[in-house]
Amino acid sequence: MAIYVTSDIHGDYKKYIQIFDKINFTDDDTLYVLGDVVDRGTGSIKILLDMMCRFNVIPIIGNHEYMAYYVLSKLVEEITEETLASFNEDFLVGMLSWTNENGGENTLKEFQKLSLENRQAILEYLEEFTPYEEIRVNGTDYILVHSGLSNFKENKPLDSYTIDEMIWARADYNKIYYKNKILITGHTPVSVILNDISADKILKQNNHIAIDCGCGYGKNLGVLCLDTMKEIYI
């Protein structure tokens, strides 16, 4: 039985599906996906449909799932002139931001090809994404969250953070958040953290593990086994 974490797959179905062969994934193992499964790539919905069928793949919400749900939940039914007229300016601005600026166009195209039943199933699955997970592996406590913990206080309960504080703000990787826990995040590519465009490996420092290796930009998809701390790259 092994515990794995990955993040920021960004619609790359080919790399996603290779994870399971590469780590010899079994029903006794667990894979935590720390958000941003969707957008940019062309296989976002295909990945979600596969994840839905795997009881031991645990999804954590990222800002891209948050944006996608906001838009797709309004588009689940057939779009007519009447429904278009009902969309307010805030929704239209949000939809354009997601599709044009954040890579949601491919996800939207995939979603529109689904049957009504599968559209509803995708939305119900997105509603199951948790804002964070706390786990213990080999005596070490881990907090898994998409982007970090904005307005952080060490004694602040995790369930008192807002969703925005967990999916948008970039973590400070030079700061120790917890003395006795390891914070694992995605969201910010390692190349951005290190200001090194060539960086594409998992970063471990200051009781913090950054696992976004840049898959959304054509770089590695990183997977980390918490039992052995072995790093796997696809």
Predicted regions and their residues:
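Active-site glycine-centered loops adjacent to acidic/histidine catalytic or metal-binding residues
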Residues: 8, 35-36, 62-63, 186-187, ...
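Active-site neighborhood of divalent metal-dependent phosphoester bond hydrolases
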Residues: 44-47, 53-133
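N-terminal active-site segment of His-dependent metallophosphoesterases
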Residues: 1-50
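A general structural motif
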Residues: 26-28, 54-56, 139-140, 179-181
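Catalytic phosphate/metal-binding cores of nucleic-acid and nucleotide-processing enzymes, i.e., regions
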Residues: 6, 17, 24-25, 76-81, ...
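Residue-level marker for buried hydrophobic side chains located in beta-strands
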Residues: 5, 33, 59-60, 143, ...
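Active-site environment of divalent metal-dependent phosphoester hydrolases
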Residues: 10-14, 39-42, 66-69, 187-195, ...
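Acidic, His/Gly-enriched loop-helix segments that form or flank divalent-metal centers
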Residues: 100-210, 214-219, 230-233
